C-alpha cells in the first residue's frame, strides 16, 4: 500500500513538525529544495537504503546509518514561497511494503503519514513521493536490478502540494511578549489545564514500535496548522530536546519541566498594537483561534497575521508568553464565572450590612399598610373599568348588531337575542352610570376620603339583578350554539365582532361568562380589603355591612343557579317518562333517582325497577322496551305524606328495606350497601322535611281523616286508607283465615288488598272500595269486609266464621310467637326411622320455654305440631349413624329421637344450649334481645290491619 497525498496537501514542514511533537518519535529529516540532496547525520534504525516503489522522496527520506554523525545544526528545513490561504488539514496513514519483494527483509514496514492542505487557486501542483517517518528505519539497502512494480492505486486527481511557506525560508522576527494584567485581589485557583496539557516525556527508542501503537499516537495527538507571517531566509530546524536551553520561570507561576518545550504546542499571539486593548486572561473567553476538538481537521485564518506557530522556536521562544493548546481543557469559564459571582455576592452583603434608621423603618411599615388598602381600592376601580368595557361590548355591540339584523332583515327571531342577553342592558346601565362613576370620584378624593365601604353599602342591594342573568346563562349559551349552526347571518355577525380588537380574541361565550363571575370577585376583593384595613378604621363597619350585602346577592345568584339546575333535572325526568306525569312545577324538587331491585310479593324474586323520589312523592317505574322516546312507565305513585320506612335485616335477602305508603308498599333491594345507605338517607331526610313543613303550616293529619266511617271496634283506623304490606305467598302454607292448607289446584292463594294476608278463594269472596286505591273495588278477606262495612246479614260465608268457635292450642301465629320467642329459625329435621330430611320453622316461645313449636312457614297462623322438651337429652349423633348433612345434633328421650341440622355452626351451638336447658327443666331469665340475622332465612313481614306487626318483629330473644 503506497503512501499518497490528498490534493492540496501541505509542505513537508507540516508533517515534520507533527512527527517531532509525537511522543517517542524521532525528528523528521528535512532537505533543501534540491530533490536529490540527502540530509546527512540523521539517526535511523538498523539498515539503510532507498525507498521502494519510486525515486527517493525529495524532502523526507530515511537516512543511512552513516549519517548519524552529522551535527544537528546541519539539518535545515526546505524553503520556498508560503501560501496565505489554507482551509483544512487531513491525515492519512499508509503501510508500505505490504507485498513481498524478493531479496528484501520483510520484518520492517514503513508507516507513511501524508498531509493534505487546501491551497489557493494561485498555487501550482508539486508532485512528491511518499513521506517516511524518521523513527522508521526504512528499507535496508537498494538492490540493483529491476524493481517490483508499485501497487496500483485507485484513479483520482494527481497529488499536488503547495511550495514551501515563506516563513520557513527566511528567519522570522518574533513579536515582543504581550503584557500581563496585574493579578486579582485574591489568589487565583490552580489552573487545571496545565496538568492536562503537559505530556510526559518519553526517550527515543531505537527498537521499532508496532504499527498499531504508532497509529494510536497520531490519532491521539491534535495537530494545529495555521499560516504565519512571511519571513525571509530559511527557518532553522529546532535542536534536540536535550539541547534546548531551559526557559525562565513564567510570571503566572506555572513551570514547564525540563525538555517539555519541544513536546507541547504553543499558541503565539502578537503583542498589542497601539490603541489595542490588552487581552484579559481572567475573562474566561476562549480565543477564536482555539484548536478544534477534531483530531483530523483544523481551521485556520484565511488572511491577516498568523495566530499559531507549530515550530517551537529556538531559545527566543523561552522569553515569549506560552499557553497550552489542549482542545479538551476543563471549564475555565466556570472558574472565572465563579469568581465574578463571589465578588457580586460580597458587594450585596456589604449593601445589606448598611443599617436602616429605625424611624425610616417605622414610616415604611405605616406606608405599606396604607398602600395595601389603596392598591385594593385601586384594583377594584381598574377591574370595574375593564368590566364595564366588557358589558359595553355585550350590550352595545353584540346585542345591538344582532337586534338590528333581526328587526331589519328577519334573519332570525328577535326573541332569540333577548333570550341570549337577558337583562344585560340593566346590568350595564347600573355599572356604567352608578357604580363606576362613584368609584372614580372616590379614588380622586382618596386623600380626603380613604374609604369605599359606604359606596358599596349603598349600591350592593342592586346586585340582586344578577340572579336573573345567572339563571338564564345555560339557556343563553345553548341558544348561541344552536343559532350559530342554524343561521348563517347570525354566525357572520358573531364572527365579525369577535375579530375586532375590543373583543380581545375571545368568543361571545367567554364574555357572557364575566357577569356570572363578577359578584364572587366583589366578595373576594372586599374580604381582602377588610383584612388590610388597620384596626379601628372608620371604614370597617361600612365595609363589613357591604360584604354581608354582597354575600346576600351572591347567595341570591346561587339560589337562582340551583333553581335552574332543578328545573333542568325535572325536564330530563319529564322526558324519561314521556310526558306521562305532570312533574314540572316550581314547588317540586327532585331528590334522587336511580335503578333498584324490587322483591316480588309472591315468590321473592328480584325485578329491575326505577325509583324517582321527589320532595312530595315517590314514583315507582318499570322500564319500557323502546329504543326511542319514553324509557319508563309509572307503575305506582306513593305520597310522602303517610309514608313509612323500615329497614330489613334478613340474612338471605341482604340490603333490603321496606317502603310503606298509603298507595302501596314496596320491598326493595339495593345492589350495594352504599346504594342502600344513600336511598335510606334520602327517604328519611325527605320525610323529616315534610313533617317540618306540616308543623310550619299547622296541618294536622286528624283533620283530613274521616273517623266516623270506621267502626268503633276496628283494630286499625288506617284499614283501607293506606296500602298494606303484602305477605309473600311462599311464607304461608295455609289460609290465614280458615287454616286450610293450600293446594295449587283446589286451594289457591289470594291476597287481601286491605290487610295483605294470604287467604284462600272462599275467604276472599268480598269486594270493598278502598280509599288508598281511589275508591276502586278490591278483593278483601271476610274480617276486613266486616271491619269496613259491618257484618253482612245473609252471607253463607259469615256463618263459618263465628267468634264462639273454640280455638286449638296450636292456633298460635308464627309471626307473633317469633316476636316473643327464646329462639326461632329454619331447621332441617328428621325423626328416627324417617326416610328423609324436612324443612320447617321452629319456635321456642318466651311464655312457653319448655315447648318446641313446629310451623310450616314463618307466617303460618297454626303450628303443625308441638314437642315438650322436658326429659330430652341433647348431644351429637353417634359414630355409626353418619348423617348426610352438616352441623347435625340430636335430642333423645327413651326410644324417641329427633335429628336437627341448622345452617351454621353458631346456630347449632345456640340451639343445643337452649334445648339442653329446656330438657333439664331449667327456668329462663329475661336476657338481652338478639338479632335473628344469623339464623333466619326469611324475615317475617308485618301485615297491616288487624294483625299488624311492629317493626321489631324480626328480632328474637335468646335467654341462654
UniProtKB/Swiss-Prot annotation:
ZnF segments: FYVE-type: 729-789
SUPFAM superfamilies: DBL homology domain (DH-domain), PH domain-like
Biased composition (Low complexity): 285-294
List of residues binding Zn(2+) 1: 735, 738, 760, 763
Listed GO CC annotations: cytoplasm; cytoskeleton; cytosol; Golgi apparatus; lamellipodium; plasma membrane; ruffle
Swiss-Prot/TrEMBL keywords: Cell projection, Cytoplasm, Cytoskeleton, Guanine-nucleotide releasing factor, Metal-binding, Phosphoprotein, Repeat, Zinc, Zinc-finger
Pfam families: FYVE (PF01363), PH (PF00169), RhoGEF (PF00621)
Annotated Zn(2+) 2 binding sites: 752, 755, 781, 784
Protein known as: FYVE, RhoGEF and PH domain-containing protein 1
Organism, as annotated: Mus musculus
Amino acid at each position: 500500500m503506497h503512501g499518497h497525498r490528498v490534493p492540496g496537501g501541505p509542505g513537508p514542514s507540516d508533517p515534520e513538525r507533527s512527527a517531532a511533537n509525537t511522543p517517542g518519535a524521532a525528528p523528521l529529516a528535512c532537505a533543501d529544495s534540491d530533490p536529490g540532496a540527502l540530509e546527512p547525520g540523521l539517526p535511523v534504525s538498523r539498515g539503510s537504503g532507498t525507498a521502494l516503489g519510486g525515486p527517493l522522496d525529495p524532502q523526507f527520506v530515511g537516512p543511512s546509518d552513516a549519517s548519524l554523525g552529522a551535527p544537528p545544526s546541519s539539518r535545515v528545513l526546505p524553503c520556498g514561497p508560503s501560501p496565505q490561504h489554507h482551509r483544512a488539514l487531513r491525515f492519512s496513514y499508509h503501510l508500505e511494503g505490504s507485498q513481498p519483494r524478493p531479496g528484501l527483509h520483510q520484518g520492517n514496514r514503513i508507516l507513511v503519514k501524508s498531509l493534505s492542505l487546501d491551497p489557493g487557486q494561485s498555487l501550482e501542483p508539486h508532485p512528491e513521493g511518499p513521506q517516511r517517518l524518521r523513527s522508521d528505519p526504512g528499507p535496508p539497502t537498494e538492490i540493483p536490478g529491476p524493481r517490483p512494480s508499485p501497487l496500483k492505486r485507485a484513479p483520482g486527481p494527481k497529488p499536488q502540494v503547495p511550495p514551501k511557506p515563506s516563513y520557513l525560508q527566511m528567519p522570522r522576527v518574533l513579536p515582543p511578549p504581550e503584557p500581563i494584567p496585574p493579578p486579582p485581589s485574591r489568589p487565583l485557583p490552580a489552573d487545571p489545564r496545565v496538568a492536562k496539557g503537559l505530556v510526559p516525556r518519553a526517550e527515543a527508542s531505537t527498537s521499532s514500535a508496532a504499527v498499531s501503537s504508532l497509529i494510536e499516537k497520531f490519532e491521539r495527538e491534535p495537530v494545529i496548522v495555521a499560516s504565519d507571517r512571511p519571513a525571509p531566509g530559511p527557518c532553522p530546524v529546532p535542536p534536540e530536546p536535550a539541547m534546548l536551553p531551559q526557559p525562565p520561570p513564567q510570571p503566572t507561576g506555572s513551570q514547564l519541566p525540563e525538555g517539555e518545550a519541544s513536546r507541547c504546542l504553543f499558541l503565539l499571539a502578537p503583542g498589542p498594537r497601539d490603541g489595542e486593548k490588552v487581552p484579559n486572561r481572567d475573562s474566561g473567553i476562549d480565543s477564536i483561534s482555539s484548536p478544534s476538538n477534531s483530531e483530523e481537521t483544523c481551521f485556520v485564518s484565511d488572511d491577516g497575521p498568523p495566530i499559531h506557530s507549530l515550530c517551537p522556536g529556538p531559545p527566543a521562544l523561552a522569553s515569549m508568553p506560552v499557553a497550552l493548546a489542549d482542545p479538551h481543557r476543563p471549564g475555565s469559564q466556570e472558574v472565572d464565572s465563579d469568581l465574578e459571582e463571589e465578588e457580586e455576592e460580597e458587594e450585596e452583603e456589604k449593601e445589606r450590612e448598611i443599617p436602616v434608621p429605625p424611624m425610616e423603618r417605622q414610616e415604611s411599615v405605616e406606608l405599606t399598610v396604607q398602600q395595601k388598602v389603596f392598591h385594593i381600592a385601586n384594583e377594584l376601580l381598574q377591574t370595574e373599568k375593564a368590566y364595564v368595557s366588557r358589558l359595553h361590548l355585550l350590550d352595545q355591540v353584540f346585542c345591538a348588531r344582532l337586534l338590528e339584523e333581526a328587526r331589519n332583515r328577519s334573519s332570525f327571531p328577535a326573541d332569540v337575542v333577548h333570550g341570549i342577553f337577558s337583562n344585560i342592558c340593566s346590568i350595564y346601565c347600573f355599572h356604567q352610570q352608578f357604580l363606576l362613576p362613584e368609584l372614580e370620584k372616590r379614588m380622586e378624593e382618596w386623600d380626603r376620603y380613604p374609604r369605599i365601604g359606604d359606596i358599596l353599602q349603598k349600591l350592593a342591594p342592586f346586585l340582586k339583578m344578577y340572579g336573573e342573568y345567572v339563571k338564564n346563562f345555560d339557556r343563553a349559551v345553548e341558544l348561541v350554539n344552536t343559532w350559530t349552526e342554524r343561521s348563517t347571518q347570525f354566525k357572520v355577525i358573531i364572527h365579525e365582532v369577535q375579530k375586532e380588537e375590543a373583543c380581545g380574541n375571545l368568543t361571545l361565550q367567554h364574555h357572557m361568562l364575566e357577569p356570572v363571575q363578577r359578584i364572587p370577585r366583589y366578595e373576594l376583593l372586599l374580604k381582602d380589603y377588610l383584612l388590610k384595613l388597620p384596626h379601628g378604621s372608620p371604614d370597617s363597619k361600612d365595609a363589613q355591612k357591604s360584604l354581608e350585602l354582597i354575600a346576600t346577592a351572591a347567595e341570591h345568584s346561587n339560589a337562582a343557579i340551583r333553581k335552574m339546575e332543578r328545573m333542568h333535572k325535572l325536564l330530563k325526568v319529564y322526558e324519561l317518562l314521556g310526558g306521562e306525569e305532570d312533574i314540572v312545577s316550581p314547588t317540586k324538587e327532585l331528590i334522587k333517582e336511580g335503578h333498584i331491585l324490587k322483591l316480588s310479593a309472591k315468590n321473592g324474586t328480584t325485578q329491575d325497577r326505577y325509583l324517582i323520589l321527589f320532595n312530595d312523592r315517590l314514583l315507582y317505574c318499570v322500564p319500557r322496551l323502546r329504543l326511542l322516546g319514553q324509557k319508563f312507565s309509572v307503575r305506582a305513585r306513593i305520597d310522602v305524606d303517610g309514608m313509612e320506612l323500615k329497614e330489613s335485616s334478613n340474612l338471605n335477602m341482604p340490603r333490603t328495606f321496606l317502603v310503606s305508603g298509603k298507595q302501596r308498599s314496596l320491598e326493595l333491594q339495593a345492589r350495594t350497601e352504599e346504594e342502600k345507605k344513600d336511598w335510606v338517607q334520602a327517604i328519611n331526610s325527605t320525610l323529616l322535611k315534610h313533617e317540618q313543613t306540616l308543623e310550619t303550616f299547622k296541618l294536622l293529619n286528624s283533620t283530613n281523616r274521616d273517623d266516623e266511617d270506621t267502626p268503633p271496634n276496628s283494630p286499625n283506623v288506617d284499614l283501607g286508607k293506606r296500602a298494606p304490606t303484602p305477605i309473600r305467598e311462599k311464607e304461608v302454607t295455609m289460609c290465614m283465615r280458615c287454616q286450610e292448607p293450600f293446594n295449587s289446584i283446589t286451594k289457591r292463594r289470594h291476597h287481601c288488598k286491605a290487610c295483605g294476608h294470604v287467604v284462600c278463594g272462599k275467604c276472599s269472596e268480598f269486594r270493598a272500595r278502598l280509599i288508598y286505591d281511589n275508591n276502586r273495588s278490591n278483593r278483601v278477606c271476610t274480617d276486613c269486609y266486616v271491619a269496613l262495612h259491618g257484618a253482612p246479614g245473609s252471607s253463607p260465608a259469615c256463618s263459618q266464621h263465628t267468634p264462639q268457635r273454640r280455638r286449638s292450642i296450636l292456633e298460635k301465629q308464627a309471626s307473633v310467637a317469633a316476636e316473643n320467642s327464646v329462639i326461632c329459625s329454619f331447621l332441617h329435621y328428621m325423626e328416627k326411622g324417617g326416610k328423609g330430611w324436612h324443612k320447617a320453622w321452629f319456635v321456642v316461645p318466651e311464655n312457653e320455654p319448655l315447648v318446641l313449636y313446629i310451623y310450616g312457614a314463618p307466617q303460618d297462623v297454626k303450628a303443625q305440631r308441638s314437642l315438650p322438651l322436658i326429659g330430652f337429652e341433647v348431644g351429637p349423633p353417634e359414630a355409626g349413624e353418619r348423617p348426610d348433612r352438616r352441623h347435625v345434633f340430636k335430642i333423645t328421650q327413651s326410644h324417641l329421637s329427633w335429628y336437627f341440622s341448622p345452617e351454621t355452626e353458631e346456630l347449632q351451638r345456640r340451639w343445643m344450649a337452649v334445648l339442653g336447658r329446656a330438657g333439664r327443666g331449667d327456668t329462663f331469665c329475661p336476657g338481652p334481645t338478639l338479632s335473628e340475622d344469623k339464623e333466619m332465612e326469611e324475615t317475617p313481614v308485618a301485615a297491616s290491619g288487624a294483625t299488624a306487626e311492629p317493626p321489631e318483629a324480626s328480632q328474637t330473644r335468646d335467654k341462654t
